[in-house]
Design a protein with these regions (language model features):
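Bacterial N-terminal signal peptides that target proteins for export
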Residues: 1-7
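Repetitive helical segments and hydrophobic/amphipathic motifs
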Residues: 11-14
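N-terminal signal peptide c-region/cleavage motif recognized by signal peptidases
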Residues: 16-18
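N-terminal, Lys/Arg-enriched amphipathic/low-complexity engagement segments
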Residues: 20-55
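Acidic/His-rich structured neighborhood in mature extracellular/periplasmic domains
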Residues: 25-30, 37, 63-64, 68-172
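N-terminal carbohydrate-binding/catalytic regions of secreted carbohydrate-active enzymes
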Residues: 44-73
């Protein structure tokens, strides 16, 4: 099962050209049903992550319908368990309708309330050595953003240095 999660994460990352974070630029009030679905997904994900014993995972969500590209998930970030217990997600989003992006640290609830196409998630668990190395980096805002490039392009070149796409940041 872990292999499938890694394959899904890799496919998502390699398909960054088509991927978006799923954020609509249209002002839209969330419905009670949307909030309930997002919070339920956050709770289910937290329980599953807690049960996994992992401290750090690559976490993906289905922000928009990318099925025409053969993709199921559109956005990913790094999730880590805090010493207090809750999970936090560090991920990059562009400012709506602009070519400027920032790295955000959110709880699972906020991560899954971001106008999802489908209320489902997938994650991959890195090796214990990778988790141990990433945990202090993710918990430290300055270190977590060291490779962040504010200039955003949805179709940025993976080896380019001028622009950066959301999923590209997570992989770098």
């Amino acid at each position: 099962m872990r292999t499938l999660h890694w394959i899904a994460a890799a496919a998502l990352a390699l398909a960054g050209v088509a991927a978006h974070a799923g954020r609509s630029c249209e002002p839209r009030q969330p419905t009670a049903q949307t909030i309930a679905q997002g919070m339920q997904l956050a709770q289910q994900t937290a329980q599953a992550l807690d049960a996994s014993g992992a401290r750090v995972v690559v976490l993906a969500r289905a922000g928009q319908d990318l099925s025409r590209y053969g993709l199921r998930y559109s956005h990913l970030g790094w999730a880590y368990r805090t010493p207090e217990g809750p999970w936090r997600v560090v991920h990059k989003l562009n400012d709506c309708g602009t070519a400027v992006a920032a790295v955000y640290r959110q709880g699972l609830g906020e991560f899954f309330l971001d106008d999802l196409w489908r209320h489902e998630a997938v994650w991959a668990v890195p090796t214990p050595a990778v988790q141990q190395a990433l945990l202090p980096v993710l918990a430290d805002g300055a270190r977590a953003t060291r490779l962040h490039q504010r200039a955003y392009s949805m179709v940025s070149y993976a080896w380019g240095t001028k622009y950066q796409q959301s999923n590209q940041w997570a992989l770098e």
